Amino acid sequence: MIYKVFYQETKERSPRREQTKSLYLDIDAETELEGRIQARQIIEKNTAYNIEFIELLSEKALEYEKETGVFEVTEF
């Protein structure tokens, strides 16, 4: 399952919509909730990012992300 994670690069400042970034993770999970939990754990272990939202991408959404040219799965 591919998850899109919206985050701020630091927890020191209050979040601003204009500074929100995203990354994509390929998580092997049985349920959507389990995948979200695993994604959060991976990011918290490897970065100091302030996670705003974790979204499971549908097939259509994944196709769109690939078409925009910004899609790249992040590996830690």
Swiss-Prot record:
The gene coding this protein: rpoY
Catalytic activity: RNA(n) + a ribonucleoside 5'-triphosphate = RNA(n+1) + diphosphate
The EC number(s) this enzyme carries: 2.7.7.6
Annotated S-S bridges: none
Protein name: DNA-directed RNA polymerase subunit epsilon
Biological process per Gene Ontology, one example term: DNA-templated transcription
Organism, scientific name: Streptococcus thermophilus (strain ATCC BAA-250 / LMG 18311)
Domain of life: Bacteria
Gene Ontology, cellular component aspect: DNA-directed RNA polymerase complex
Keywords in alphabetical order: DNA-directed RNA polymerase, Nucleotidyltransferase, Transcription, Transferase
Gene Ontology molecular function terms on file: DNA binding; DNA-directed RNA polymerase activity
Lineage: Bacteria, Bacillati, Bacillota, Bacilli, Lactobacillales
